[in-house]
């Protein structure tokens, strides 16, 4: 996604691809595109939006703002749809990095999916929630001894090896624990997905995985086979995020299965018979804006499964089990962030033009993606109806940073005012999980809504939480 052009130019004078088309009527500003907003979200005749039967005005009054609101049915339905598309929950590993708390871990468990974690903290939350360790896979490019030890002691299903150092480290830890740990090797296949540079992870110049092109991946595989306490059960690859087509996956599968063929040729069918998994990672895209059009999950799954079957048959191998790791595709669409408008300011940027800034009570501390990735979002007035004409505005946060932007350019009702509630769609992935305490602003609460009821999932941080980290007397 491209950043909005910088510089003091009036927003309405910009003819940039990222500036949305001007709505033709006030009613158009009120529309909530079903491909972007949660499944159980509707706007009433009074303009107030409800999610799963709960008005957002009630949520804001009870829990405060900013507030993350999760449509539980939306999250669970996406779990079921993806599991059905890929042949069962055991082949779908929810990527905890998108968003994890104990409640989410329980939902994922109840829907029969497996779970990917990337740190000791994510592992601890999953185990605290009672998630079965045997269905957990541990990722990460720099797993510490403590993290690997905790994983082995918990009995996790798989560890994805990311370096040769880690092979020796994990072999020693598993040996000391008296277990044989199932592992996959993460292979860098040289595919750069058509996405933002910072989240494209399978090209060569990056910190993840072991290169196929240089032979590092095969060398790592040889080292795993030489250990006493590791069992290689498959190969892993991840080519990026927010991907809308299968072209990159097809190339990745071709190269990973080609490597699997070489491994079988070198070590023999008997010794490699347990290598039954090809994990193509995550990266399945979602709609952030009304015109976004990712493929239906069943269509994407059918294509990926056929690619793996075809590539395996081409090299004379039995079809391995295809594993995928969706995070955003499950967590992203069913959550919105509620903000309260604090100030509205028209700033002159030339003798004849101005820019409207709508400031809300959160910002880059609860959603860094706009600043970090130039991400785009759909934002709407959700607390009332308005027949005012559209005005192009920039929704910004309250932090001491000029780049603190929630939505760079969006059309709002011209009468938007302090006290109004703004909803930002599709914030369930990589918003709370990447949140911070910048300016010592406390993290928002998270609530789940279902069947007309709302319940607190994560409470709002307080000043007492901030002060609890202080060491008295120093």
From Swiss-Prot:
GO terms for molecular function: diaminopimelate decarboxylase activity; pyridoxal phosphate binding. Pyridoxal 5'-phosphate binds at residues 283, 325-328, 430. Residues 1-25 are annotated as: Disordered. Its cofactor is pyridoxal 5'-phosphate. It catalyses: meso-2,6-diaminopimelate + H(+) = L-lysine + CO2. The keyword Cell division does not apply. Keywords: Amino-acid biosynthesis, Decarboxylase, Lyase, Lysine biosynthesis, Pyridoxal phosphate. Substrate binds at residues 328, 369, 373, 401, 430. The modification N6-(pyridoxal phosphate)lysine is found at residue 97. Its EC number is 4.1.1.20. Residues 9-25 have a biased composition (Basic and acidic residues). The active site is at 400 (proton donor). GO terms for biological process: lysine biosynthetic process via diaminopimelate. Pfam families: Orn_Arg_deC_N, Orn_DAP_Arg_deC. Transmembrane segments: none annotated. Pathway: Amino-acid biosynthesis; L-lysine biosynthesis via DAP pathway; L-lysine from DL-2,6-diaminopimelate: step 1/1. Belongs to the Orn/Lys/Arg decarboxylase class-II family. LysA subfamily. Homodimer. Specifically catalyzes the decarboxylation of meso-diaminopimelate (meso-DAP) to L-lysine. PANTHER family: DIAMINOPIMELATE DECARBOXYLASE (PTHR43727), GROUP IV DECARBOXYLASE (PTHR43727:SF2). This is Diaminopimelate decarboxylase. It comes from Mycolicibacterium smegmatis (strain ATCC 700084 / mc(2)155) (Mycobacterium smegmatis).
């Amino acid at each position: 996604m491209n950043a909005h052009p910088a510089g003091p130019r009036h927003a309405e004078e910009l003819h940039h691809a990222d500036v949305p088309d001007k709505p033709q009527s006030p009613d158009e500003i009120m529309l909530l595109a079903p491909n972007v907003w949660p499944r159980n979200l509707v706007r009433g005749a009074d303009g107030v939006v409800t999610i799963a039967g709960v008005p957002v005005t009630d949520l804001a009054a009870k829990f405060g703002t900013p507030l993350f609101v999760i449509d539980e049915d939306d999250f669970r339905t996406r779990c079921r749809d993806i599991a059905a598309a890929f042949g069962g929950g055991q082949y779908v590993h929810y990527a905890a990095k998108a968003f994890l708390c104990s409640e989410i871990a329980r939902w994922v468990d109840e829907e029969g999916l497996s779970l990917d974690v990337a740190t000791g903290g994510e592992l601890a939350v999953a185990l605290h929630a009672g998630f079965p360790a045997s269905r957990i896979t541990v990722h990460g490019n720099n797993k510490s001894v403590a993290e690997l030890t905790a994983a082995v002691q918990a009995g996790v299903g798989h560890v994805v090896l990311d370096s040769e150092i880690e092979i020796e480290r994990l072999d020693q830890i598993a040996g000391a624990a008296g277990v044989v740990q199932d592992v996959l090797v993460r292979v860098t296949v040289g595919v750069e997905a058509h996405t933002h540079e910072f989240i494209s992870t399978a090209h060569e110049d990056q910190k993840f995985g072991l290169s196929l092109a240089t032979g590092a991946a095969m060398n790592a595989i040889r080292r795993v086979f030489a250990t006493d306490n590791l069992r290689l059960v498959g190969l892993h690859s991840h080519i990026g995020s927010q991907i809308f087509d299968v072209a990159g996956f097809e190339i990745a599968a071709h190269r990973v299965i080609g490597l699997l063929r070489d491994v079988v040729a070198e070590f023999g069918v008997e010794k490699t018979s347990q290598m039954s998994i090809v994990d193509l990672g995550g990266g399945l895209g979602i709609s952030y804006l009304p015109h976004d059009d990712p493929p239906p999950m069943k269509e994407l799954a059918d294509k990926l499964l056929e690619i793996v079957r075809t590539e395996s048959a081409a090299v004379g191998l039995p079809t391995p089990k295809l594993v995928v790791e969706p995070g955003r595709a499950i967590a992203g669409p069913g959550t919105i962030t509620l903000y309260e408008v604090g100030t509205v300011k028209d700033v002159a940027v030339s003798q004849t033009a101005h820019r409207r800034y709508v400031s809300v009570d959160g910002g880059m501390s609860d959603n860094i993606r706009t600043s970090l990735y130039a991400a785009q979002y759909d934002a709407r007035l959700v607390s009332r109806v308005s027949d005012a004409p559209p005005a192009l505005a920039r929704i910004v946060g309250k932090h001491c940073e000029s780049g603190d932007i929630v939505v760079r350019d969006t059309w709002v009702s011209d009468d938007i005012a302090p006290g109004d509630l703004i909803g930002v769609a599709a914030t369930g992935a990589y918003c709370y999980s990447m949140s911070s305490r910048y300016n010592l602003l406390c993290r928002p609460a998270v609530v789940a809504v279902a069947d007309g009821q709302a319940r607190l999932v994560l409470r709002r941080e307080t000043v007492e939480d901030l002060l609890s980290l202080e060491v008295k007397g120093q």
